[in-house]
A protein has these predicted regions:
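Residues at the starts of beta-strands that form the adenosine-phosphate
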Residues: 14-16, 40, 91
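C-terminal helical subdomain
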Residues: 122-159
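The conserved SAM/SAH-binding core of class I Rossmann-like methyltransferase domains
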Residues: 19, 44, 95
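Canonical Rossmann dinucleotide-binding motif of NAD(H)/NADP(H)-dependent dehydrogenases/reductases
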Residues: 1-17
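Rossmann-like short-chain dehydrogenase/reductase
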Residues: 2-5, 25, 48-116
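Conserved glycine-rich Rossmann-like NAD(P)H-binding loop of the short-chain dehydrogenase/reductase
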Residues: 12-28
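Rossmann-fold cofactor-recognition segment
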Residues: 33-53
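A short acidic, often aromatic-flanked loop/helix-cap motif at beta-alpha or helix-coil junctions
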Residues: 49-52, 100-101, 118-126, 155-158
């Protein structure tokens, strides 16, 4: 769902390291990037639930990252803590679903949240498209805002 986000960042000239649980999704991602830009994409298959393997993959990144976009399911805290431990100064964006309670921390931990909502169209609602998710996450990254909602999460009884 974040493939468009990766492509958008690469199109801006950024270098991106993408981690995903399946090699097939990483291969599809790589193939979707223009050949001339693929040198700015590194991929690592890694199940984020295996913290040792994740730490190894993160340590293998050749250039210290300035930002990380983490969309991990519960329990996400160990993954986020590992990213923070390895890269203390990183701009960490945590992507969460519409029903996830947004953490209210001291600002030192997971201080940037991107909450994915839904879209209301007339008397119906729908979940965000992959393109809307990707565009919203890139916008959130570039905005510098501590909290961003893509779409809406209210009224909750209108969700799909």
């Amino acid at each position: 769902m974040l493939a468009g986000c990766v492509r958008g960042l690469i199109a801006r000239g950024d270098r991106v390291t993408a981690l995903a649980r399946s090699q097939s999704s990483l291969s599809a991602l790589s193939e979707s990037v223009p050949a001339a830009d693929r040198d700015r994409l590194r991929t690592h298959p890694c199940d984020y639930r295996d913290l040792e393997a994740l730490a190894h993959a993160l340590r293998s990144i050749p250039v210290r990252p300035s930002a990380a976009i983490c969309w991990v399911h519960t329990p996400a805290e160990p993954v986020l803590e590992l990213v923070r431990a390895l890269f203390p100064d990183i701009d960490l964006l945590r992507v969460v679903g519409s029903s996830t309670e947004v953490p209210r921390g001291d600002g030192a931990r997971f201080d940037r949240i991107v909450r994915l909502g839904f879209v209301i169209e007339g008397d119906r609602s729908r979940w965000l498209s992959n393109e809307e998710i990707s565009n919203g996450v890139v916008s959130a990254l570039l905005s510098g805002q501590p909290s961003t909602t893509v779409g809406t999460v209210t009224p909750w009884d209108a969700h799909p």
